[in-house]
Structure formats: C-alpha cells, structure tokens
Amino acid sequence: MGLMHVVVMGVTGSGKTTVAKGIAQARQLEFIDGDDLHPAASVAKMSAGTPLTDEDRWPWLDLVGEWLQERPRAVVACSALKREYRDRLRAMAPGTVFIHLAAPHSVLAARVEKRLTDEGHFAGPDLLASQFEALQPLGFDEPGGVIDVSTASPTEVMEVALELVDALDV
C-alpha cells in the first residue's frame, strides 16, 4: 500500500463528512473534516449566508493540501467545487483522488435545512445555490469517481465509495 489521498467532495449537504469518516474507518486512513480548517472569518461569513470567494478559499485549500501532504494515507471531506481547487490540492498532494457525492439541489436543500435545524451547522440553505453555481464536475482526466447520493441509502453510498477507493488505491 502506497500513498493514498482521498478527497470526498461535493456541495453542502451531500454527505461528505459521513462518507469520508466511513472510508477512514474502513480503510484505516487518517481523517479530517475540511470545515475544521476554515478560519473563523470564513465560518462567520458562511454562517451569515455569504458565499466564500476564491480569495477566501485559497488559504483554506492550502491548509487542506498541507494536511494531506503530511500524511501518507488520509481522507478529507472538502467541497473542492472547482477544477482549479482540485488542481491545487493535487499539486500539494500528488496522486490525490476525488469522490464526488452528487445529488440535485432539491434533494440537498431538504438535507441542509434539516441539518441546520438539528445540528446548527454553519452552512445553511443560502449557500447551496452559490455552491451549485460554482460546482465544476470532475473532468474525464481527473482520477476519482462520482456517486449519485440522491436515491441511494447511506449503506449503498458507502459500499460504492469503498469500491472506488479500493479501485483507485495504487
């Protein structure tokens, strides 16, 4: 087993943290939720429903990349919405693969609203539309895969995610 860097990506409410934690546990990888690396100013901005700009994101992405770089086998939950964000992470941690959790806006809006009510998560429904606008799907040349989480059960999503990780582990 060599280096293994996995980024579970997608818009808010897609299940990134749950899936990344499951992968970490099942494959003995270190885990971090990329949200935990956001500076307080960015969290405050998102809590107010203000989308982050690229300028807000670059320092955060650098922290995510550094975290991956320092660990031989790790998984991170990180939105990684744009190709240039993913390119930056790959430049810092070569060989990083991306698992994109995808679902329509309508499905995720209900999840985000519930999470906001139940858990008080900082990313509310106001951010969802801007994240969908920013989202650039994985390119054909980007290592990784896409999982449709709109109708699959959490167990099914995890099974597919683990199959992807195993197939991508070099």
Regions found by a protein language model. Name each.
Residues 11:
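P-loop (Walker A) phosphate-binding loop of NTP-binding proteins
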Residues 92-112:
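Conserved phosphate-donor/acceptor-positioning beta-strand/loop module used by diverse small-molecule
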Residues 21-65, 112:
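Conserved substrate/cofactor phosphate-moiety recognition/catalytic segment
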Residues 5:
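Walker A (P-loop) ATP-phosphate-binding motif of ABC ATPase nucleotide-binding domains
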Residues 8:
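Hydrophobic anchor at the beta1->P-loop junction of P-loop NTPases
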Residues 53-94, 101:
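Glycine-rich phosphate-binding loop used to anchor ATP phosphates in small-molecule kinases
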Residues 118-160:
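Small-molecule kinase domains that catalyze NTP-dependent phosphoryl transfer to phosphate-bearing small molecules
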Residues 16:
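Conserved lysine of the Walker
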